[in-house]
Amino acid sequence: MIILKSSQEIEKIREAGKIVAEALMLAGEIIKPGVTTWEINSQIEKVIVSHKAYPSFKNYNGFPAASCISPNCVVVHGIPSKKVILKEGD
């Protein structure tokens, strides 16, 4: 079933997309060897919260972070960690 959106709903979706784009651009700038996935997550969360928004992953079914970061063999929904330090090629 297709649910049609109102112009106000479409504008909210557009605003959310801009916030996500900003967070992803920042993530792309800070991802480098030596950075933890937790640091990346923290910066992503700051961007989202700075727009008075809330990261939808955080606390969803107990997920502890604002983002899912899945380097290498982690297939999906990787939990950011201070122990996961990116290396060259990740």
Feature roles, as predicted:
Residues 1-90:
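Active-site neighborhoods and metal-handling regions in enzymes and metal-associated proteins
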